[in-house]
């Protein structure tokens, strides 16, 4: 028969499809398996109403056969097959989908299709075969036909359709593989191990058994005996045809059919984790978008989690066929640590399964999963606190950055999941637990920030707050103060840094007395400010300190911990984003009394003392003095 031209598009379009649409050559096998599954679906559906089909559900299968000698890969099915006209229609027109037409007819007939899922975009996925094959041959015998037909093409030049013989109903797709090049090894797709790898990766959950040759080793009797008269055994490699796909996804099974232990084992195998997940979340949603999901909250972060190389996202399936290895659109950034799968028959796919045509369905799924994850984490916090704290110690910072990102858009979602170390209780508490435990006369949520919770709890600035019997939250991550800044308040209680000037702890009488003291010791504070110069924005008499001589507080919106964070950034200007330091003096401390006396009797010595006390305040705040060597010399001068 004369060669026919492709009806829909030119050579250029076919080349564009082959070279551009699919980013991975290996998905050609996924597409051809999906088409085979579609064909079996159709015949299985026919068998429900046509007794002449003569096949039970267990009779259907897909077979993959690699032939290294002839350089061919054959994908066979015993599905409904195609007539010559259907070959013309489905294979001769690029982007025409026979499977799509079948599904529309099925929907229109409003028949019972609970067990019939069509996953193909047949006319498109079929052409992915040309990525690896120099020639594609399709031999198909349609159900109800006595003869078969052969469709053959070597690419965009066209195709031929000729009658041929085939004993059974079904389709064989035979790929004559391209020759290997320096850049591409096409023959690898003929090897049994590679076929198994790709089926496991993309088509493990296709509903029909996929058979292929599997190489195994077995012992055999050599016919020889040893000195003791015992038969000698040898080991040989044998090839047997086996079913290599799981068929029924674990997420499609009920809790009775798949226990939590089964799900955990699945997680460890598929996601290469050695530890049990903190939680397993199962979702079965029906509605505008129907889908099933199985999500896992890991117990530890992947080794590359905090690097640019880490790619978040859930595995996305359509009726058991993997569409994307990692779909980032299914998870908000704040829950990027969650791993798992989503499987939906309702996803709209475009010309390639690797790119979704519309993202509306994904947005609906993502919004629902976000609520499910939040609900599960809230449940853990309430019912299994030890397990939740284990999770939070690993991923709590991620939740905090989730609030900081998008200008606080996720604050309502995440705030109640946060934990901070209580200085009073010496354990992690939520903001709700902190507020519920506050005395009636406590105005603010007090917090202290340092490099570690232990250091934060011991800051000199905490003395006045703790003397009142008020608890303090210990901030120790880069995100903590930014979170407090964005939240502003919780349960109508504002956040207050213990390093702030006004802690709201003084009565009007105490404020008046303090103002009088400030005026009385103004010569001392002026002297220290003049001595320290621009190193401090101000020097004040402290209203916070009890046991320490000095401490640093700040004026303005940038705190000492924020400054530390900004200056740790690559290329940061050390003179930019600086906290406005205020040195506070404790008049009741012997060192400050000695400073004031020296100011009046020996100003030169007093200047040395002022610098030493400032350096001490820096050290207590976790800040290295600008010139440690000078600090050492100043201390020696005082002896």
Residue ranges and their predicted role:
Residues 1-189, 197, 220, 439:
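GHKL (Bergerat-fold) ATPase N-terminal catalytic module, capturing the glycine-rich phosphate-binding loop
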Residues 118, 139-158, 178-639:
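GHKL/Bergerat-fold ATPase module in large chromosome/replication-associated machines
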């Amino acid at each position: 028969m004369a060669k026919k031209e492709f009806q829909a598009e030119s050579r250029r379009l076919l080349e564009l499809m082959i070279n551009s649409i699919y980013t991975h050559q290996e998905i050609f096998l996924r597409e051809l398996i999906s088409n085979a599954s579609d064909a079996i679906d159709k015949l299985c559906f026919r068998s429900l109403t046509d007794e002449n089909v003569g096949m039970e559900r267990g009779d259907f299968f897909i077979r993959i056969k690699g032939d290294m000698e002839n350089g061919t890969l054959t994908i066979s099915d015993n599905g409904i097959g195609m007539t010559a006209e259907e070959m013309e229609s489905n294979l001769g027109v690029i982007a025409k989908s026979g499977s799509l037409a079948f599904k529309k007819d099925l929907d229109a007939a409003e028949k019972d299709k609970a067990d019939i899922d069509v996953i193909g975009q047949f006319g498109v996925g079929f052409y992915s075969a040309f990525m690896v094959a120099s020639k594609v041959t399709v031999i198909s015998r349609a159900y109800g036909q006595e003869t078969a037909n052969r469709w053959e093409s070597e690419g965009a030049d066209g195709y031929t359709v000729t009658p041929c013989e085939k004993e059974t109903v079904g389709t064989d797709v035979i790929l004559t593989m391209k020759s290997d090049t320096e850049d591409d090894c096409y023959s690898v797709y003929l090897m049994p191990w590679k076929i198994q790898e790709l089926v496991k990766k993309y088509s493990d959950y296709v509903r029909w058994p996929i058979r292929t040759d599997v190489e195994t080793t077995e012992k055999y009797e050599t016919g020889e005996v040893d000195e003791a008269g015992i038969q000698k055994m040898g080991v040989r490699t044998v090839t047997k045809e086996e079913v290599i796909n799981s068929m029924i996804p674990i997420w499609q099974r009920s809790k009775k059919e798949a226990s939590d232990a089964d799900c955990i084992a699945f997680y460890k195998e598929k996601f290469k984790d050695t530890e049990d997940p903190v939680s397993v979340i199962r979702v079965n949603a029906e509605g505008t978008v129907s889908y099933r999901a199985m999500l896992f909250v890991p117990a530890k972060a992947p080794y590359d989690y905090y690097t640019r190389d880490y790619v978040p996202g859930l595995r996305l399936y359509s009726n058991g066929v993997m569409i994307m290895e990692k779909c980032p659109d299914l998870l908000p950034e704040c829950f990027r640590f969650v791993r798992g799968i989503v499987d939906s028959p309702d996803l709209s796919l475009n010309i390639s399964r690797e790119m979704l045509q519309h993202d509306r369905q994904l947005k609906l799924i993502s919004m629902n999963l976000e609520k499910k994850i939040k609900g599960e984490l809230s449940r853990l916090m309430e019912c299994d606190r030890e397990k939740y704290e284990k999770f939070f110690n690993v991923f709590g910072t991620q939740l905090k950055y989730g609030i900081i990102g998008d200008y606080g858009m996720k604050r309502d979602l995440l705030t109640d999941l946060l934990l901070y170390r209580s200085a009073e209780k010496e354990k992690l508490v939520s903001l709700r637990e902190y507020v519920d435990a506050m005395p009636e006369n406590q105005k603010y949520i007090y917090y202290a920030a340092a490099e570690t919770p232990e250091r934060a709890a011991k800051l000199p600035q905490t003395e006045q707050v703790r003397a009142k019997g008020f608890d303090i939250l210990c901030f120790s991550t880069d995100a903590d103060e930014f979170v407090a800044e964005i939240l502003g308040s919780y349960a109508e209680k504002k956040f207050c840094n213990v390093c702030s000037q006004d802690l709201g702890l003084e009565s009007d009488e105490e404020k008046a007395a303090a103002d009088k003291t400030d005026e009385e010791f103004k010569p001392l504070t002026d002297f220290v400010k003049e001595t320290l110069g621009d190193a401090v924005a101000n020097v004040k008499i402290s209203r916070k300190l009890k046991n320490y001589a000095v401490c640093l507080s700040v004026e303005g919106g940038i705190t000492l911990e924020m400054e530390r964070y900004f200056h740790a950034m690559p290329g940061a200007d050390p003179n930019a984003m600086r906290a406005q330091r205020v040195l506070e003096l404790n008049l009741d401390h012997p060192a400050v009394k000695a400073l004031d006396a020296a100011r009046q009797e020996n100003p030169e010595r007093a200047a040395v003392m002022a610098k030493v006390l400032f350096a001490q305040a820096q050290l207590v705040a976790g800040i290295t003095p600008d010139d440690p060597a000078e600090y050492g010399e100043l201390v020696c001068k005082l002896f």
